[in-house]
From Swiss-Prot:
This is Phosphatidylinositol 5-phosphate 4-kinase type-2 beta. Pfam families: PIP5K. The keyword Cell membrane applies. It is a peripheral membrane protein. Its EC number is 2.7.1.149. GTP binds at N203, V204, K214, D369. Keywords: Acetylation, ATP-binding, Cell membrane, Cytoplasm, Endoplasmic reticulum, GTP-binding, Kinase, Lipid metabolism, Membrane, Nucleotide-binding, Nucleus, Phosphoprotein, Transferase, Ubl conjugation. It is found in: Endoplasmic reticulum membrane; Cell membrane; Nucleus; Cytoplasm. It catalyses: a 1,2-diacyl-sn-glycero-3-phospho-(1D-myo-inositol-5-phosphate) + ATP = a 1,2-diacyl-sn-glycero-3-phospho-(1D-myo-inositol-4,5-bisphosphate) + ADP + H(+); 1,2-dihexadecanoyl-sn-glycero-3-phospho-(1D-myo-inositol-5-phosphate) + ATP = 1,2-dihexadecanoyl-sn-glycero-3-phospho-(1D-myo-inositol-4,5-bisphosphate) + ADP + H(+); 1,2-dihexadecanoyl-sn-glycero-3-phospho-(1D-myo-inositol-5-phosphate) + GTP = 1,2-dihexadecanoyl-sn-glycero-3-phospho-(1D-myo-inositol-4,5-bisphosphate) + GDP + H(+). Residues 64-70 are annotated as: Required for interaction with PIP5K1A. The gene is Pip4k2b. The modification N-acetylserine is found at S2.
Length: 416
């Protein structure tokens, strides 16, 4: 089962030292007739399928309340001898959306307009991420970096069905104010007889603010260091021991710490009730001063390049990059933010460092990987690790109640 795969379900804007395109002009070709052009057939089918299902849903009235059958429902379409747009789409494919009414309701509760969601997934091809789970889990972001698309296993799909009703009820009760993953859609794509399952969530990290350092924290210290291979990446995912050895702290202030831990405790208690464990707190850190310095350097280079190309007359325009065309209502009216500023309705997991902190930072924090039930396989792994490391060791495969308690305690200690 895929439950042994730990992975990062957020994709950051890479540090500018690695990718110097933040303020360069980006050109996204947006045709009136969508061509769903992507680098591989599976992504073209995803774009086509989401476009199709959202269009179909727009003709279905929003019910007063969801019914039990909505949590078992699906819509599927089989396309044969597809001649239109054959240079981009395979001639035969199948697309299935799970629980369409439920996920539409969840998108609404998370403040995501269906038109915005459709545009983000279909306007330009999703982007591959270098984040990858140990079992080959694949991550992509939508072109505007608002949503993460993750491949999952059929077991994960089954587990989603198991928890979806209670998850939805929890989201209703907390009014969408949660650190849990925001599940927005779940699909099965069949191309050349191969089935691929995908789940779409809101990106934990910002589409705009660069993440300079990130951590996957479980509250366990056994075998919880980033590998040398991981550390060689432009933006490695560090782990618990790396965090502790660096003496890292998240300096948010007393009030923000109290509010965050209350929300975390409520979310984690819910996961323990569902017998779910092995989740992580994903943490991204945006260094405001470093970002300003990188921005200035890139703007200077861009200005020099553009002024060389355009002549002296273009000088005033050279200082400003052009953001990509943006989906529907969320970004119809551009808003200009100062350094380290963000829109809390978009960057819902963001939190500023306290005014007294030695460095001005923005933290992005959310719970990820919640589709791991405490089943027989986990119990066996726990027994094996206990034999190897001893009963007192902080291993990650404890039971859900122990896991949640240890998780809360660890997170309480790293916030200040």
């Amino acid at each position: 089962m895929s439950s042994n795969c730990t992975s990062t379900t957020a994709v950051a804007v890479a540090p500018l030292s690695a990718s110097k395109t933040k303020t360069k002009k980006k050109h996204f070709v947006c045709q009136k007739v969508k061509l769903f052009r992507a680098s591989e057939p599976i992504l073209s089918v995803l774009m086509w399928g989401v476009n199709h299902t959202i269009n179909e849903l727009s003709n279905v009235p929003v019910p007063v309340m969801l019914m039990p059958d909505d949590f078992k429902a699906y819509s599927k379409i089989k396309v044969d001898n597809h001649l239109f747009n054959k240079e981009n789409l395979p001639s035969r494919f199948k697309f299935k959306e799970y629980c369409p009414m439920v996920f539409r309701n969840l998108r609404e509760r998370f403040g995501i307009d269906d038109q915005d969601y459709q545009n983000s997934v279909t306007r330009s091809a999703p982007i591959n991420s270098d984040s990858q789970g140990r079992c080959g889990t694949r991550f992509l972001t939508t072109y505007d970096r608002r949503f993460v698309i993750k491949t999952v296993s059929s077991e994960d799909v089954a587990e989603m069905h198991n928890i979806l009703k209670k998850y939805h009820q929890f989201i209703v009760e907390c009014h969408g104010n949660t650190l849990l993953p925001q599940f927005l859609g779940m699909y099965r794509l069949t191309v050349d007889g191969v089935e691929t399952y995908m789940v779409v969530t809101r990106n934990v990290f910002s589409h705009r603010l660069t993440v300079h350092r990130k951590y996957d924290l479980k509250g366990s210290t056994v075998a919880r260091e980033a590998s040398d291979k991981e550390k060689a990446k432009d933006l490695p995912t560090f782990k618990d021991n790396d965090f502790l050895n660096e003496g890292q702290k998240l300096r948010v202030g007393e009030e923000s710490k109290k509010n965050f831990l209350e929300k975390l405790k409520r979310d984690v208690e819910f996961l323990a009730q569902l017998k779910i464990m092995d989740y992580s707190l994903l943490v991204g850190i945006h260094d405001v001063d470093r970002a300003e310095q990188e921005e200035t350097e890139v703007e200077d280079r861009a200005e020099e390049e553009e002024c060389e190309n355009d002549g002296v007359g273009g000088g005033l325009l050279c200082s400003y990059g052009t953001p990509p065309d943006s989906p529907g209502n969320l970004l119809s009216f551009p808003r200009f933010f100062g350094p380290g500023e963000f829109d809390p309705s978009v960057d819902v997991y963001a939190m500023k460092s306290h005014e007294s902190a030695p460095k001005k930072e923005v933290y992005f924090m959310a719970i990820i990987d919640i589709l791991t039930p405490y089943d027989a396989k986990k119990k066996a792994a726990h027994a094996a690790k206990t034999v190897k490391h001893g009963a007192g060791a902080e291993i990650s495969t404890v039971n859900p109640e122990q896991y949640s308690k240890r998780f809360n305690e660890f997170m309480s200690n790293i916030l200040t």
